[in-house]
């Protein structure tokens, strides 16, 4: 059984820094994060879709500026190749599909059997970002949750205009213990 992990909130106790790991109605394992941000949905949308920003935190190289239904190719990053010895597919066969794109409120895509959904809604103070990753492998929940939490830290720093002075992959390794 997966434990729900909560920590001190970001805005008025409503925003947990930790993701929650849960079982979906169809029995799959998923991770959910919620962030309350001081920025309008349009700025948050740019932070999760702009290739220049994605390269600082997203675990693959991908062009999301495509029509809904398009096949996507998620390439291994240079850092993953260097650090983990991961190899990119030389044939660059599609390994995903864009399922929904409704700027600036919903982005959903399939990647290697997983569904990733980004929902952005306006709030009086800015935006609520809800990210859900439905996993293909339940054993990947802990490292995936740590990785997404580290990535969201970079997104928030980018939105704040703050320099990212840490290594997101090393940060994910630090956070992994919080999901055990």
Feature roles, as predicted:
Residues 2-64:
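Hydrophobic ligand-binding cavity/cleft-lining segments
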Residues 2-16, 135-180:
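A conserved amphipathic terminal alpha-helix motif
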Residues 21-22, 64, 98, 118-120:
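A structural signal for short hydrophobic beta-strand segments in well-ordered beta-sheet cores
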Residues 27, 88-92, 110-112, 123:
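A generic structural micro-feature
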Residues 28-34, 71, 93, 106, ...:
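Intrinsic-disorder/low-complexity, polar/charged segments enriched in Ser/Thr/Lys/Arg/Asp/Glu/Gln
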Residues 32, 51-91, 167-174:
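Short beta-edge strand/loop motif at the mouth of beta-sheet-based domains
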Residues 99-100, 105-157:
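Beta-strand/loop substructures that line and gate deep hydrophobic ligand-binding cavities in soluble
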């Amino acid at each position: 059984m997966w434990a729900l992990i909560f920590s001190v909130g970001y805005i008025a106790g409503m925003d947990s820094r930790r993701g929650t790991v849960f079982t979906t109605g169809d029995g799959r394992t998923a991770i959910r994060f919620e962030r309350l941000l001081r920025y309008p949905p349009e700025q948050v949308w740019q932070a999760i879709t702009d290739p220049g920003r994605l390269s600082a935190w997203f675990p693959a190289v991908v062009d999301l500026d495509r029509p809904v239904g398009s096949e996507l190719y998620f390439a291994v990053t240079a850092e993953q190749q260097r650090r983990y010895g991961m190899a990119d597919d030389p044939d660059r066969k599609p390994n995903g599909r864009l399922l929904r794109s409704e700027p600036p409120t919903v982005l959903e895509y399939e990647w290697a059997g997983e569904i990733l959904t980004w929902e952005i809604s306006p709030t009086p103070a800015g935006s609520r970002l809800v990210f859900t990753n439905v996993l293909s492998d339940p054993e990947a929940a802990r490292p995936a949750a740590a990785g997404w939490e580290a990535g969201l830290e970079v997104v928030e720093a980018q939105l704040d205009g703050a320099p990212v002075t840490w290594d997101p992959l090393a940060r994910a390794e630090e956070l992994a213990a919080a999901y055990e």
